[in-house]
Amino acid sequence: MLKKCILLVFLCVGLIGLIGCSKTDSPEDRMEAFVKQWNDQQFDDMYQSLTKDVKKEISKKDFVNRYKAIYEQAGVKNLKVTAGEVDKDDQDNKTMKHIPYKVSMNTNAGKVSFKNTAVLKLEKTDDEESWNIDWDPSFIFKQLADDKTVQIMSIEPKRGQIYDKNGKGLAVNTDVPEIGIVPGELGDKKEKVIKELAKKLDLTEDDIKKKLDQGWVKDDSFVPLKKVKPDQEKLVSEATSLQGVTRTNVSSRYYPYGEKTAHLTGYVRAITAEELKKKKEGTYSDTSNIGIAGLENVYEDKLRGTTGWKIYVPQTGEVIAEKKAKDGEDLHLTIDIKTQMKLYDELKDDSGAAVALQPKTGETLALVSAPSYDPNGFIFGWSDKEWKKLNKDKNNPFSAKFNKTYAPGSTIKPIAAAIGIKNGTLKADEKKTIKGKEWQKDSSWGGYSVTRVSERLQQVDLENALITSDNIYFAQNALDMGADTFTKGLKTFGFSEDVPYEFPIQKSSIANDKLDSDILLADTGYGQGQMQMSPLHLATAYTPFVDNGDLVKPTLIKKDSQTADVWHKQVVTKEGAADITKGLKGVVEDERGSAYQPVVKGITVAGKTGTAELKTSKDDKDGTENGWFVGYDYENKDLLVAMMIQNVQDRGGSHYVVEKAKKQFQSN
C-alpha cells in the first residue's frame, strides 16, 4: 500500500513538471506556420499570430477584409512566400528575432516579387509564451511601409470601331454630352429645377434626388445624371438653361445609323457582376463594357482589346506593377451604308429581312432586319414608353431575321432546276406535257395533289416553268431526280451545313428528318414541304446563276483582294446557269411573270418570287404568308438582293415584295 502511494505522488509531480516546462514553438516554426497560412491566403488564421500591438491597431475583421480585398482586386495568383533562417545577429536576443522572407505572385498587372524581413516578438499570455509576428502593410507589398496605401486601377482599352466599306462609322467612340447638376448652384429653385429636368431627361424626380444624396456629393460637385446622343444639342441647350444644370463631355460608344444597322452592329452595355465572374480574371473590370448582340458580340474579343492594370502607391506615385492596356482592333466591313439605308427604308414598316450581295465577289452590301430598335437606347437609356413598346411588339424587334430560317417558297425552283440540270434529269429545252391545274403521281397519293396557278400551258419547258412558276413542273423535276440525288444536290448548295460566314447564320434544312415520301419530295421541289432557308443563304444560293456556276462564299469582313472565294465549285454548269438566268429574266420582263409588275424602266433584273404559305393544312383559312423576291442585275452583275416580308396575305403576296426590291436596282 505504501509503495502505491509513493508511485502515485511521483507520477503527479512528474506531470506537473512536464506542464510547467512545456516547450514554446521556435521562431522558425512559428514563421513556417504563418507562411503556410499566408500562401493559402488564410487571413483569419494569420491574425492569430500577430503581436498584441498590431491587434490593437487593427481588428481581425478589418485585417481580413483589407488584405483579402487587396489580393482579390489585384488578381493575385500563384502566391509563393518562403522564409529563411533567423538573423545571426539575433542569436543572443531572447525576445526578438528577424527572419528574412521572399514573396512572389502573379497579379493582373504582372508579376510582383520582393524580399523583406519579418520581426517576431516573444510575448506572454496568461499561462504561456509565443513568438508573434510584428505585422505591417509592407508584408503585402514592400512599398507600403510608413503608413502608405495601395491603389489598384484598371485601365480600359479603347474599343475597336466598326466601319462600312467606305470608312463610314457604324459603331464609333465619340465624345457625347453628359448633363448634370452642381448642387450648390441650385439655390432656392432646387425643387423646381429637379421637376423640370426630370421631364426633359425622361427621369423621375426620385432618380435625380438619389444621385444628389450620394455620400461623395458636395456643393461644388458635378453630379452626372444622363448622357445624351450627339444629335440632341437642342435638349442639351434646354436642360443647361436651368439654374444649376450644366454639361460635360464624356467618351461613349455611339451608333450613328441607329435602327438602320442595329441587328448588324448589335450593342454594348456595362458588364454585370454575373458576367464578370465568368470571365477570365483580369480581362474585364467592373467598369467594363461588353458586346451583347450583333458584331459587337461576335467580335467581342477583337473589338474589346485587353484591359490594363496598375498597382501603385498614391502618396508617392511609385508603381508596384503595371500592364499596359491594349486597344481593340477596328472592323472594316463590306457593307455599303447607302445600300443598307435604302433597303431598311423599304422594310422599316414591315416585319422581314433583306440581304444585298455583290454576287461575283460574295461581299455583303447590306444586312437588314425589321422591325428594328435603336441600339443607342442601351447606351443613353430608354424612355418607359419606348421600352414597353419594343417589348410588346409581337414581331420581336430585338431579334435579327436575316440569319434565321424560313420556308423559301418558289424561290427554291431555280436551285431545284440547277440540280436537275447538273444531274442530267432535266434539260432546259425539253418540254413536259402537263394538263390541268392539279396533278398527282398516282393513286397512292389519295386525295393529295400538286396545284399550279394556270393550266394554259400544256407543253412546259424550263423557261416557261420559271416564268409561270409552275409547281407541277418542279414537283416532277424533284421526283425525276429521286430523294437521294435531290438531297445531295441541295447539299452542294450549302444545305445542312454551316454557312462559312463571319456572322452566325442558322443552318438551312431540307426536311425535319429526310425526304421519306414522294409527296414530301414533290412539295420540297417547288418550295413548300419542310424546307427552311435563311435570307443570307438564299441570296448566296443564287450566285451560281450570275456568272459561271460556282457557289460563291459570302463575306462580311473587308479584305485586300476583291476576288471571290468559292464555297462549292460548279454546282451547275455554265450553260445551265445561263438557261436559268434566261427564265428568271422572263419572270421580271415577260408580262406573264410574277415579278413583271410594277414595270420599272432602266433596270436589267432577273429574279424569282416566292410565297410561302404557313398553314396547318390546305383548308386552313387563318394561315399567314411570307413573300419573297430574289433578283440580280444580269448585265452589270454587281448587285443581288433577297427580300422576305412576313404577313403579306391580303397585301398582294410576293408582289408586295417585288415593288420594294426593284427600287434597289433602280437607285443603284
Swiss-Prot record:
Q: Which reaction does it catalyse?
A: Preferential cleavage: (Ac)2-L-Lys-D-Ala-|-D-Ala. Also transpeptidation of peptidyl-alanyl moieties that are N-acyl substituents of D-alanine
Record carries keyword Protease: yes
| SUPFAM superfamilies per UniProt | beta-lactamase/transpeptidase-like (SSF56601), NTF2-like (SSF54427), Penicillin binding protein dimerisation domain (SSF56519)
Give the membrane topology. Answer: Single-pass membrane protein
> Per its UniProt record, what Pfam families does this chain match?
MecA_N (PF05223), PBP_dimer (PF03717), Transpeptidase (PF00905)
- Stated EC number for the protein is 3.4.16.4
Location(s), subcellular = Cell membrane; Forespore inner membrane; Forespore outer membrane; Membrane raft
Tell me the superkingdom of the source.
Answer: Bacteria
Phenotype of null mutants: No visible phenotype in growth, sporulation, spore germination, outgrowth, or spore heat resistance. No visible phenotype in the absence of antibiotics; loss of resistance to oxacillin and cephalexin but not penicillin G. It cannot be deleted in the absence of a catalytically inactive copy of penicillin-binding protein 2B (pbpB).
Molecular function GO labels: penicillin binding; peptidoglycan L,D-transpeptidase activity; serine-type D-Ala-D-Ala carboxypeptidase activity
Q: Tell me where the transmembrane regions lie.
A: 7-23
Tell me the active site.
Answer: S410 (acyl-ester intermediate)
Q: Membrane: is it a keyword of this entry?
A: yes
Kindly state which keywords UniProt assigns to this record, in alphabetical order: Antibiotic resistance, Carboxypeptidase, Cell membrane, Cell shape, Cell wall biogenesis/degradation, Hydrolase, Membrane, Peptidoglycan synthesis, Protease, Transmembrane, Transmembrane helix
Functional summary from the UniProt entry: Penicillin-binding proteins (PBPs) function in the late steps of murein biosynthesis. Probably required for both cortical and vegetative peptidoglycan synthesis. Although not usually required for cell division, in the absence of PBP 2B (pbpB) it becomes essential. Confers resistance to oxacillin and cephalexin.
Task: Write the protein's name.
Answer: Penicillin-binding protein 3
Provide the species name: Bacillus subtilis (strain 168)
**What taxonomic lineage is listed for the species of origin?**
Bacteria, Bacillati, Bacillota, Bacilli, Bacillales
Give me the gene this protein comes from. pbpC
